[in-house]
Amino acid sequence: MKDNQEQAAPIVYWRIDEWFPDLSPDLRTRLKTYHEELLKFNRTLNLISAKTVFVADALHFADSIMASQAIMKSNPSLDKIYDLGSGNGFPGMIFALLYPKVQVVLVEFDQKKCEFLNHVAGVLKLSNVTVENRTIESFPDGSMKYVMARGLANISKSIMMTRKVVPKGGVFYHLKSEEWGIEVGDIPTQLCSVWAPSLVGEYKLPIGAIKFSVVKTDKIA
């Protein structure tokens, strides 16, 4: 009876090959390797929520692929970008895999998560990735022209955190849900005189009906 009572282990999906056939076989293999390393280290580091483990291919990988493509399409001359609060490597590690000519700096305060990021960058042989184990505020003023973040904070808090490190003319790309307009509406008036928000792109994941968005804030003063 024991065998009948035991429930089958949930399936951990991997559908990137099916969803993104335009990506090269080598790139899809490296994405799968990243997925395997993520699940292995997640047992001790809590890199992603347990609820998302089985559909990480959609909620983390596909989301980061589509967001990265939207960012690059809007700014094809991009040559360096900072991923703030990188933690599990989304979207920065994915961005680096997709665009090997772009230098990607993963900024993370947690040392153990930085060790994970360095490990993955090494396994994937990503020479365009640098991991910085430090706070955002510790970077020199005006040193980050292009930055992005996924799950760091709401837009208001994110631009407050980077008000010194992002120079005039710099851009912050925020990965958000379809309710991004609420966050934009909550930006204090004094910040709106310094940062100009706009929508870069919207997309739906290969599963589900929820829209995801990339919103940018241009630093205008």
Swiss-Prot record:
Pfam families: GidB (PF02527). S-adenosyl-L-methionine binds at G85, F90, I136, E137, R150. GO terms for cellular component: cytosol. One of its GO terms (molecular function) is rRNA (guanine-N7-)-methyltransferase activity. It is found in: Cytoplasm. SUPFAM superfamilies: S-adenosyl-L-methionine-dependent methyltransferases. It catalyses: guanosine(527) in 16S rRNA + S-adenosyl-L-methionine = N(7)-methylguanosine(527) in 16S rRNA + S-adenosyl-L-homocysteine. Coiled coil: none annotated. It is an enzyme of class 2 (transferase). Its main location: cytoplasm. PANTHER family: S-ADENOSYL-L-METHIONINE-DEPENDENT METHYLTRANSFERASES SUPERFAMILY PROTEIN (PTHR31760:SF0). Belongs to the methyltransferase superfamily. RNA methyltransferase RsmG family. HAMAP family: 16SrRNA_methyltr_G. This is Ribosomal RNA small subunit methyltransferase G 3. The gene is rsmG3.
